Amino acid sequence: MSDTEDNKNKQTTRRDFMVLTASSVAAVGAVCTLWPLVDSLNPSADVLALSSIEVDLSNIAVGQTVTVKWQGKPVFITNRTPDKIAEARAVKMSELIDPETDEARVKAGHDNWLVTIGICTHLGCVPLANQGEYDGWFCPCHGSQYDSSGRVRRGPAPLNLAVPPYTFISDKKIRIG
């Protein structure tokens, strides 16, 4: 081999090393720049704290409704009586504006517990519990009426009261969210 060929190989090797080094520095710089941007898309600690709540059901008497706050919204938790459950299950689907069975709105084995988001599906008012013709909820803003299962029966509301995601941690405690 001649001296010129050795120099070309060394230059090529040196050039490859410089390209690899520059590329590595650029990649590290890009990651360091993008990491805070991507991390800022994650929910903040206060949002995560509000994403789920646990509610003790042992203080809610049969026939009573309590309101808790979840993600800034009122949530109605009702301990229904056997009569209210039977009444809700006797309703024909053809009588409902937004047909949904009572069984679909509660957790199996916990039929007495109804958990709904307390916001009228018409314009977002908060309905009053144990009011109206159907002894469920009555929206004072525009007169929508819900039965004891939170299903809309009369008025301008197009949908039933929403059921939030929830699970039973024990027989006397639920986690909403």
Swiss-Prot record:
Top-rank taxon, per record: Bacteria
SUPFAM superfamilies: ISP domain
InterPro entries, per database record: Rieske_2Fe-2S, Rieske_2Fe-2S_sf, Rieske_Fe-S_prot, Rieske_Fe-S_prot_C, TAT_signal, TAT_signal_bac_arc, Ubiq_cytC_Rdtase_Fe-S_su_TAT, Ubiquinol_cyt_c_Rdtase_Fe-S-su
Keywords on record: 2Fe-2S, Cell membrane, Disulfide bond, Electron transport, Iron, Iron-sulfur, Membrane, Metal-binding, Translocase, Transmembrane, Transmembrane helix, Transport
Compartment list: Cell membrane
Cofactor note text: Binds 1 [2Fe-2S] cluster per subunit.
Keyword Oxidoreductase (UniProt): no
Segments crossing the lipid bilayer: 18-38
Disulfides per UniProt: 125-141
Gene Ontology MF term list: 2 iron, 2 sulfur cluster binding; metal ion binding; ubiquinol-cytochrome-c reductase activity
Record domain Rieske: where: 88-175
UniProt enzyme class: translocase
One Pfam family named in its UniProt record: UCR_Fe-S_N
Chief localisation class: membrane
Binding positions for [2Fe-2S] cluster per the UniProt entry: 120, 122, 139, 142
Further remarks about this protein from its record: The Rieske protein is a high potential 2Fe-2S protein.
Record-stated family: Belongs to the Rieske iron-sulfur protein family.
Name this polypeptide is given: Ubiquinol-cytochrome c reductase iron-sulfur subunit
Record gene name: petA
